[in-house]
């Protein structure tokens, strides 16, 4: 399990990915609520996401941002991209994340693009496979990002020196 990342030490930006109106039918009619999905990141290798639900949109957004700050993860970045190719899974959604050459930009759509930009990854290629609802794409992307390892981390896990690893 990763250690806790203190959001107060970071200069975080937030972005609302989606706001969904949810109704519950009760005896007296319909009850309206709102669900918001927010992503926070410092554009320097830290990113988190969460959902917030409330009777008013601003309150749902505030709850989502506050919860996202508590779920930050650290993303290993090599130059301007990720260290290696990875596939993240969540539910019926899959996301393929591939490193890209410097200057190629973020080739990702929708919610995946927001995660990458707030994580500070400038060059990456991605492909969404399976279902593409925003929350499942974000969760699959975060799953993929948590699987990333740097060359030094892999060498330490294998018990060898980083220079002995092949490219």
From Swiss-Prot:
Spans through the membrane: none
Signal peptide limits: none
Gene3D superfamilies: 3.30.160.20, 3.30.230.10
Pfam families given in the database record: Ribosomal_S5 (PF00333), Ribosomal_S5_C (PF03719)
GO CC aspect terms: small ribosomal subunit
UniProt entry keywords in alphabetical sequence: Ribonucleoprotein, Ribosomal protein, RNA-binding, rRNA-binding
InterPro entries: Ribosomal_Su5_D2-typ_SF (IPR020568), Ribosomal_uS5 (IPR000851), Ribosomal_uS5_bac-type (IPR005712), Ribosomal_uS5_C (IPR005324), Ribosomal_uS5_N (IPR013810), Ribosomal_uS5_N_CS (IPR018192), Ribsml_uS5_D2-typ_fold_subgr (IPR014721)
Record-level GO BP terms: translation
GO molecular function, one term: structural constituent of ribosome
All copies of domain S5 DRBM, residue ranges: 12-75
Functional summary from the UniProt entry: With S4 and S12 plays an important role in translational accuracy.
Subunit structure: Part of the 30S ribosomal subunit. Contacts proteins S4 and S8.
Family according to the record: Belongs to the universal ribosomal protein uS5 family.
UniProt free text on domains: The N-terminal domain interacts with the head of the 30S subunit; the C-terminal domain interacts with the body and contacts protein S4. The interaction surface between S4 and S5 is involved in control of translational fidelity.
HAMAP family given in the database record: Ribosomal_uS5_B
Protein name listed in UniProt: Small ribosomal subunit protein uS5
């Amino acid at each position: 399990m990763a250690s806790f990342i203190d959001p107060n030490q970071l200069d975080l930006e937030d972005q609302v990915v989606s706001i969904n109106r949810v109704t519950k039918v009760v005896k007296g009619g319909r009850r309206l609520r709102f669900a918001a999905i927010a992503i926070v990141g410092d554009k320097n290798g830290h990113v988190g996401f969460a959902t917030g639900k409330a009777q008013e949109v601003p309150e749902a957004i505030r709850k989502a941002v506050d919860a996202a700050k508590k779920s930050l993860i650290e993303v290993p970045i090599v130059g301007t991209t990720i260290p290696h190719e990875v596939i993240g899974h969540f539910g019926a959604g899959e996301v393929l994340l591939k490193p890209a050459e410097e200057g190629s930009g973020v080739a990702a759509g929708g919610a995946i693009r927001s995660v990458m930009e707030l994580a500070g990854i400038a060059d990456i290629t991605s492909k969404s496979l399976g279902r593409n609802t925003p929350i499942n794409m974000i969760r699959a992307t975060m799953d993929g990002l948590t699987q990333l390892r740097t060359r030094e981390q892999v060498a330490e896990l294998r018990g060898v020196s980083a220079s002995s690893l092949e490219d």
